[in-house]
UniProtKB/Swiss-Prot annotation:
Broad enzyme group: transferase
Record localization: Cytoplasm
Designated gene of the protein: thrB
Reactions catalysed: L-homoserine + ATP = O-phospho-L-homoserine + ADP + H(+)
GO biological-process terms attached to the record: threonine biosynthetic process
Single Gene Ontology MF annotation: homoserine kinase activity
Claim: Transmembrane helix is one of the keywords in the record: no
Pathway: Amino-acid biosynthesis; L-threonine biosynthesis; L-threonine from L-aspartate: step 4/5
Chain sites annotated for binding ATP: P96, I97, G98, S99, G100, L101, G102, S103, S104, A105, C106
Name of the protein in question: Homoserine kinase
Function: Catalyzes the ATP-dependent phosphorylation of L-homoserine to L-homoserine phosphate.
Keywords (A to Z) from UniProt: Amino-acid biosynthesis, ATP-binding, Cytoplasm, Kinase, Nucleotide-binding, Threonine biosynthesis, Transferase
Pfam families registered for this protein in UniProt: GHMP_kinases_C, GHMP_kinases_N
Length: 314
């Protein structure tokens, strides 16, 4: 039996729409992510679901993304004259769906890594990552890797999609704390994509290029002040903020409390605030708990970048 944990991820990081993503873990050691357990059975295939958010999963097993991961893995293995073993997959759904924290990516990545390890790793990391992107595209409507890549590989990942690589890891800032606030409401990725304009002004395109280029440069040269200043979003945030509760007010208040940057995590409704130290992070967490959460399913976590990525649990 194997138990595979896949951590939450924050895509875009404001400045890198569909291009940047970070794996995230709470500093208190709690597991913010999904777990997939895989084990032998005498014959056939079984899928079970558990976890806090299990009630949010599709009722039909065929619509469960873990089932779809199993089917895709089986198809790819057959192309290599291989066959899947009789097995049971159990998804522990600990991540809220439509949260902006890579919930679907957690399930996809944990399932595919579990299946690959269970079958003695017939697929390389890049082959698995390509499968992960394909499955993610079925949910959101377009293939993108900014959640699955950091969730799988850890760290902050830049999508390059050239020279045989889907992504490359960016050096980042170990001193930064990420305060993540999920309000307890759902925003579908497809809905959040549909709200974006079909085209952008030249001014916005230039600004986006300047911000992203400067941010990547700042990461490589370890200029934390410049990196934080460049965490601006002219592509998605102006259009998506209407889907989030009191976003403009919360963003300004977070800045007043000492946040280096605040933005939408993925397609929302989770937001993130970057804090320079734990004292500021604690202030931000307290504020967001009282002013951003909408119901008792919401939560706030003080986090750091998770450099391990997906891993087996003991």
């Amino acid at each position: 039996m194997l138990r595979i944990y896949a951590p939450a991820s924050s895509a875009n990081i404001s400045v890198g729409f569909d291009t940047l993503g970070a794996a995230i873990s709470p500093i208190d050691g709690s597991l913010l992510g999904d777990v997939v357990q895989i084990e032998d059975i005498p014959a056939g295939f079984e899928l079970e679901s558990a976890g806090y958010f299990v009630r949010k999963l599709p009722k039909e097993p065929q619509k469960n993304i873990v089932y779809q991961a199993y089917v895709l893995f089986s198809e790819r293995l057959k192309l290599r004259n291989g066959h899947v073993k009789p097995l049971r997959l159990t998804l522990e759904k600990n991540m809220p769906i439509g949260s902006g924290l890579g919930s679907s990516a957690c399930s996809i990545v944990a399932a595919l890594v579990a299946l690959n390890m269970f079958h003695n790793e017939p697929f390389s990391k890049m082959e698995l990552l390509e499968m992960m992107g394909e499955l993610e595209g079925r949910i959101s409507g377009s293939i993108h890797y900014d959640n699955v890549a950091p969730c799988y590989l850890g760290g902050v990942q830049l999508m390059v999609q050239s020279l045989g690589n889907i992504c490359q890891q960016l050096p980042f800032f170990d001193s930064w704390y990420w305060v993540l606030a999920y309000p307890g409401i759902e925003v579908s990725t497809a809905e959040a994509r549909a709200i974006l304009p079909k085209s952008y002004t030249r001014q916005d395109v230039i600004a986006h290029g300047r911000h992203l280029g400067s941010f990547v440069h700042a990461c490589h040269t370890q200029q934390d002040v410049l990196a934080a200043l460049m965490m601006k979003d002219v592509i998605a945030e102006p259009y998506r903020e209407s889907l989030l509760p009191n976003f403009a007010e919360v963003k300004q208040a977070s800045r007043d409390l000492g946040a280096l940057a605040t933005g939408i995590s993925g397609s929302g409704p989770t937001i993130f605030s970057i804090a320079p130290d734990l004292a500021v992070a604690t202030k931000l967490a307290n504020y967001l708990e009282n002013h951003y959460l909408q119901n008792n399913e919401g939560f706030v976590h003080i986090c750091k970048v998770d450099n391990q990525g997906t891993r087996a649990l003991g």
